[in-house]
């Protein structure tokens, strides 16, 4: 059992924070280009600095700098803030957050009333940090957004976080992307989702889960709160998509389904096209990097033309679709008034495809920001070029300049908002 009163680590794994570093090391671990540490000017900064000294923990000046930014926002009277300590910043030096850093950070956040979002993506918090993240979810009743993607969290850390969410009633958005929680950790998340009544967006993509659709399918039959689910790189095959579709007949809440980078072929599209005939909640469907080919695209096109009027966005990027299937999708858009976003790059374009999508854009049926191609003419022939739009272009990386949250580059989140910055 976890000790809910003490902040010390348990006797077993995860281990206690390391012994105190030498004083010279503790004094400065990151500093701005000028070489001096930032001035301690705010409440969060002061708490963090003092707690590091009290616990003989090395001060991470990247964290200190980010707390300074939030302190300034708090001074302006702002609430509902996200503390962004992402470890993949291209604009400043970064010392990545470790599990021991997260131990200190979680202690100063657990009673903070101004912060309801925490982004620590691309750091090194591991299972040690996952333990303290789980405790934070138990104690911090304002947190609605937690981004832990790519943090070396394993099955044990995944289990701790999933179990913490059994009783949590505030968290709405969790990203576990890229943490290798494997099937063991995935089982705990599937079980949690049959109990949890608040989580609306969950990303378990690239977590080394294999054919997780049996358990997540059972979850979808029971859960009526989840709005967005990412299952990228789950090794889903046609039998897996059938299990998901069986669950979608009974689910009335899911609006965004991401099954990109799997092994779904045209046979799987038979099941999906059939469920789309009756499903009225699904609005965004990401099939990128599968292999549905012409036949799969035609199954979808027929349903979109004749039955479905709820789907708003479809991505079939890199699915080995040729002109026949791509033209069929374009024809369905002329009939279906709801489908507004279509992404097709990475397939096999012929001239008929180029003409068909050029005509959709010229007539205003397909807006330039709602697709990943644009038309141009050379010697009287129409061609398509790629543009940087998509459902989640800036999901795994940040541009070196410009905004990372352009609506056209991250259309999926614009189409299915949960609230605020989520």
Language-model-derived ranges and their functions:
Residues 1-422:
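Leucine-rich tandem repeat or coiled-coil scaffolds
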């Amino acid at each position: 059992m976890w000790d809910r009163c003490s902040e010390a680590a348990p006797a077993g794994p995860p281990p206690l924070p390391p012994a105190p570093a030498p004083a010279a090391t503790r004094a400065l671990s990151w500093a701005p280009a000028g070489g001096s540490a930032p001035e301690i000017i705010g409440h969060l900064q002061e708490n963090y600095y003092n707690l590091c000294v009290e616990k003989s923990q090395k001060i991470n000046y990247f964290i200190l700098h980010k707390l300074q930014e939030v302190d300034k926002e708090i001074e302006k009277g702002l609430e509902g803030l996200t503390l962004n300590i992402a470890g993949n910043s291209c604009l400043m030096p970064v010392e990545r957050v470790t599990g021991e850093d997260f131990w200190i950070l979680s202690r100063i956040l657990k009673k903070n009333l101004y912060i309801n979002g925490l982004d620590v993506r691309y750091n090194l918090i591991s299972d040690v940090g996952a333990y303290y993240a789980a405790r934070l979810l138990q104690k911090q009743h304002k947190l609605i957004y937690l981004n832990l993607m790519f943090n070396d969290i394993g099955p044990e850390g995944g289990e701790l976080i999933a179990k913490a969410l059994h009783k949590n009633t505030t968290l709405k958005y969790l990203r576990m992307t890229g943490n290798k929680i494997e099937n063991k950790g995935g089982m705990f998340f599937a079980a949690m989702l049959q109990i949890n009544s608040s989580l609306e967006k969950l990303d378990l993509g690239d977590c080394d889960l294999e054919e997780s659709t049996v358990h997540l399918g059972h979850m979808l039959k029971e859960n009526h709160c989840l709005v967005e689910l990412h299952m990228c790189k789950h090794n889903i095959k046609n039998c897996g998509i059938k299990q998901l579709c069986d669950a979608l007949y009974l689910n009335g809440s899911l609006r965004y389904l991401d099954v990109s980078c799997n092994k779904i072929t045209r046979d799987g599209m038979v099941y999906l096209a059939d469920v789309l005939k009756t499903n009225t909640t699904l609005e965004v469907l990401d099939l990128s990097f599968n292999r549905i080919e012409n036949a799969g695209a035609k199954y979808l096109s027929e349903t979109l033309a004749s039955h479905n009027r709820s789907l708003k966005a479809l991505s079939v990027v890199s699915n080995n679709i040729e002109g026949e299937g791509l033209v069929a999708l374009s024809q369905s858009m002329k009939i279906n008034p709801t489908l507004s976003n279509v992404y097709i790059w990475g397939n096999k374009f012929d001239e008929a495809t180029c003409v068909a999508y050029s005509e959709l854009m010229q007539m205003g049926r397909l807006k330039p920001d709602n697709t990943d191609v644009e038309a141009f003419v050379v010697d009287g022939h129409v061609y398509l070029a790629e543009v940087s739009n998509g459902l989640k272009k800036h999901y795994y990386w940040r541009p070196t300049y410009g905004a990372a949250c352009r609506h056209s580059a991250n259309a999926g989140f614009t189409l299915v908002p949960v609230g605020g910055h989520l």
